[in-house]
Each structure stands twice: as C-alpha cells, then as structure tokens.
Amino acid sequence: MTWETARRAIDLAATGKMPFTLQFSGGEPLLALPLLRQMADYVRSNRIPARMDLQTNGTLLTEETATFLRSARIGIGVSLDGRPAVHDALRCYPDGRGTAADVVAGIRQLAQCGMEIGLTTVVTADNVAELSGVVEMAYYLGNVRRVGFDLLRPQGRGSAVRRARAEDMAQAMEAVFALNRKLGRMIGHSMAITQMEQAACLAQRTGSGFSHCHAMNGAGVHVDALGNIYACSSFVGDAHFLLGNVERGIDVQRRKEVALEMQNAMAFCRTCADFSACGGACYARRAGQGPPAVSAAECALKRAAMKALLNVAVQCNKRTGQ
C-alpha cells in the first residue's frame, strides 16, 4: 500500500467525524513498518479520533518496533495457535522452521515495553484438541490480557485446511473455560476470553440482529493494498463484494445491498432459540460452503461461551445470596 492510498483511507473513515477503529492486518502489517509510522503520525498530528489496533504473527517484534507501537498507542493482537510444538506444526518459515520461539521473543519485547496484548488462535482440526494450551501460554507470558478463538475461514489457503468439528469444539472450549477458572483462582484473576466477553455484551442488549458482524450491519469495511474497499477482509479480490475505492469513496447503496444479502443468506440463524444471545454466525465462514451445518462448530463455540457466562452468574448469585 502506498502512503497516498493509506492517507485517503484514513481521511475517508474520518469524514463522519466520529470515533472509529483503524485495524492494521494483512498479510503481515509489520512488513510495512515505515508506512505504519506515517499513518500513526498522521492520525496523531491531525487529531483524528481513531483507535489503532494491529494484528501480527509476532515474528517481527523487535525492541525498536515494540517501542514504536507503545509510543503510538497501537493495540496489539498476536497470533498463537497453541503451545510451541503445536504452533510450529501450523506456522512455519519458508525453510520449515517453526515460528513459536520468535513469537514468544516478540511478545517478551512488548512486555519489556509495558505493553499488554491479546492472543488470537485460529482453530482448525489440527489444533482444536490443544486449545487449553493457549490459555496456559497466556498465563505463562504474563502480559496477555485477552485470548480469542477464531474458527478457520475457508478462503484462500484456508480452503485446503481441515475444519474443526462441532463436538470437538464444544469439548475444547469446556476445557478452556475450566482451566481459565482454575488458573484464575490460583493467581487471583482470570484471563478475559473474547467469546465470553461478547456473550456478556449480547446478554445486555435489548434488540436483536446480526450484531457481531460489521459487514452485515454496514458499519465496517476493509481497504486492500490497492485502495479497493470490500465489505469484509475475507472477500478481497471478489468483485461481488467490492464497495468502492479510496478515491471515489463507498457506494452506499451497494453496501446496503451486500449487507442485506449476507443477512438473508444467514436467515437460518434467526430460527435458533439462541440467536439473540449469540448474534448469529459468520457469513464469510459459511459462504459457498453448503448447508447451515457448516456453522455447527461456531455454534458450539458460542454456546460454550454462553454456558460459561451463565455459570459465572450462578456463582456470583450464590456468593451474594440471591
């Protein structure tokens, strides 16, 4: 991405004069560190009301980079798919070496700068049985404030990877929440689990709808390296989901049409008794993959989070005598 494209993307997002989130993702965004510096400086010097977040594979987190990220107040999410052996089997350098050691070293660089982070785990059939290891790693590292689990989306290289089964997902998340409670009692506070936080937010809402997805609500877009604007990062290169570009802006009517198309395709979610507490499944994860059954693992993930939240509420009520 050129600086001119990046600047136009920021300016376009800022036209509404309302706070927004600027998410740097990839590929690997730290490969474009000079551009990130320019963008962060531009946001700060122009007092643009943007929260900046970055999702990284963690292998390029040097002391210099960590210092910059802290000074720019950029929130950090690091991809970690399990304990080192599990992660190395899934994420390797071109020469076959695993990346786990460099990821852990990068996270420690952030810790030395006083930065807390979130961990994101992409769940597949190859690591679903080992998800509790991510929780162990989060406590071990010491500067992790949140762990999130993201089921594989079958686009691009992901189309060749085996997806986790619903029954395995349910069992894995039960183990995750149990271990989190156990370790939390030992040190005095539990790790935040993204799916449980989402369930807590949804439990407080008064309306209904596909609240989890910015694309389905017309509330977020993805800008690619060429400045093209898509409804979701999962559909980069697919002209059907092209909404405009940073020069011409967003086709508002097309954005509405795409959002409605996504909602209609996921209409089966509305018939579920858990819909209001779930927010619906991910359109991108299901698109082109057949019947609603392909969302079963996601349903299992969310139901496990709702169950864990209910258990917390029950325990709180017992302690307060309600």
Can you say where each PLM-predicted feature lies in the sequence?
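Radical SAM/AdoMet-radical enzyme domain recognition
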Residues: W3-S25, A32-L152
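Short, solvent-exposed loop/turn segments at secondary-structure junctions
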Residues: P29, T59-L60, R83, T124-A125, ...
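Short acidic/His/Gly/Ser-rich catalytic and metal-binding motifs that mark active-site loops
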Residues: P84-D88, G156-S159, A281
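C-terminal accessory region of radical SAM enzymes
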Residues: D168-A203, I229, S233-G279
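Radical SAM enzyme core and accessory elements
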Residues: L226-N228, F241, N264-Q322
